[in-house]
From Swiss-Prot:
Any GO CC annotation of this UniProt entry: cytosolic large ribosomal subunit
Gene Ontology molecular function: mRNA binding; structural constituent of ribosome
Family matches, as SUPFAM superfamilies: ClpS-like, Ribosomal protein L7/12, oligomerisation (N-terminal) domain
NCBIfam families, alphabetized: L12
Similarity comment: Belongs to the bacterial ribosomal protein bL12 family.
Statement: the UniProt record of this protein carries the keyword Ribosomal protein: yes
Entry keyword set: Ribonucleoprotein, Ribosomal protein
Gene Ontology annotations of biological process type: translation
Designated name of the protein: Large ribosomal subunit protein bL12
Oligomeric form and interacting partners: Homodimer. Part of the ribosomal stalk of the 50S ribosomal subunit. Forms a multimeric L10(L12)X complex, where L10 forms an elongated spine to which 2 to 4 L12 dimers bind in a sequential fashion. Binds GTP-bound translation factors.
Amino acid sequence: MKEDGMAKITTDELIESFKEMTLIELSEFVSKFEEVFKVTAAAPVAAAAAPVEPAAEAAPEKTTFDVILEAAGDKKIQVIKEVRTITGLGLGEAKALVDGVPSKVLEGANKDAADAAKAQLEAAGAQVSVK
């Protein structure tokens, strides 16, 4: 990193910046970080022992997910607020998305972003599925 008179950012300052970002912004950050540093954010998995006989070809693991709002529940206003937070949509667009269930809140998101969005929406009282 260049030291062109710029102050070094502390870990705490980075964390505070992340707290202010939406899930989509964080997902984009992780993707860019992985690209720039040629790393992956996936948790390491312990290697399993090789099977004695060749196993049937496993289905490829899904890497992108859609978050589907199935029902808004009793707390529709809270669900609209969460949809706005997750997607960055305006009030009218978020309301239309919630009113038009089932509807996609996120499309092509990574597993972590999809799970986080699902948890946020469920905490607001919505019924959500990830496909």
